[in-house]
Amino acid sequence: MNSYDPQDTGSQQEETVALKGHFYGVYLLCSQSLDPRYRGKCYVGFTVNPKRRIRQHNLGCDFGGARKTSRKGPWLMVMIVHGFPNNTVALQFEWAWQQPSLSTRLKMYPELKRKLPRETFFDYNFRILSHMLGVGPWNRLPLTVRWLETDYERPFSKTLPNHMEIVSGKVSISASQRRRPDDAVPPPPVAWASECHLCMQQIEQPEKSRLGCTNQMCRLTCHMVCLANYLLGDETGHYIPVGGECPLCETRLSWAALLQRKRLLMGVPEELQDHDEDLSDDIDVDSDIEDGAQELSN
């Protein structure tokens, strides 16, 4: 799934719409400053809204940008990794990308501790990312690596897990999936069974514990735990599956797609619809990559 050729225009996507409140991204900035002290320096950060975040960085810390990027741009957001299940996991990924020599998962790789001679800051950060995507727990996450600037696109030196995607194109955040044209036909209601197809027990609190197949013609109804255990099969040491086949219709399932469908069926919480600006990007945004951070702040 993740085979990707930067010259292949078929892999280009102009825009992907993500639902507000369900997008968590970790991005890489590259400075385009004319000042040689800053040009080419990089910055890793977390965001729930990429368009707004790059605007804040380029306006400066007085407008919500990070202190360490203020007056050292303009900045380009060249790539973003998204598909994290929540902001906690995304922030942990951000911190490890920023601090590979301190991360429990990465510090055993001495080659990641410092930038190599003649290696650009972008190449160094890209090398760290390549390692991260092949290391647990991140190698089991249904992540998408999205190139935002074509001039920086390049193939990964290491093969990524098959369930990860590498794409190109901008991201926009939709305020609500319920915003449809007045004449749009609403989707048909989902026909749920009252019992789990796997354990045959009644599903209590279905809004929290029920999952179904992504195939709209399939009537699979399961406890979340039951379906997770089924998809894991004989795989030991894990609690969350990557994917597998539907036990009813044999459709190939992605665990991330199952959870996304569940969120869409539940709708967007009112607090997320009304307070987009409260979805702060500012947690840990003032920390930098360890190597080069001192140079960037001078």
Curated annotation (Swiss-Prot):
SMART domains in the record: GIYc
Coiled-coil ranges (or none): none
Gene Ontology CC: Slx1-Slx4 complex
Enzyme Commission numbers on file: 3.1.-.-
Necessary cofactors: a divalent metal cation
First and last residue of the signal peptide: none
Subcellular location: Nucleus
GO MF annotation list: 5'-flap endonuclease activity; crossover junction DNA endonuclease activity; zinc ion binding
Domain GIY-YIG residues, every copy: 22-108
Domain of life from the UniProt record: Eukaryota
Zn-finger region bounds: SLX1-type: 196-249
UniProt keywords, alphabetically: DNA damage, DNA recombination, DNA repair, Endonuclease, Hydrolase, Metal-binding, Nuclease, Nucleus, Zinc, Zinc-finger
Protein's GO biological process: double-strand break repair via homologous recombination
Broad class of enzyme this protein falls into: hydrolase
Primary localization: nucleus
UniProt-annotated stretches for the region Disordered: 275-298
Protein family membership: Belongs to the SLX1 family.
Record's subunit section: Forms a heterodimer with mus312/SLX4.
UniProt function note: Catalytic subunit of a heterodimeric structure-specific endonuclease that resolves DNA secondary structures generated during DNA repair and recombination. Has endonuclease activity towards branched DNA substrates, introducing single-strand cuts in duplex DNA close to junctions with ss-DNA.
Name of protein: Structure-specific endonuclease subunit SLX1 homolog
Organism field: Drosophila sechellia (Fruit fly)
Name of the gene encoding the protein in the UniProt record: slx1
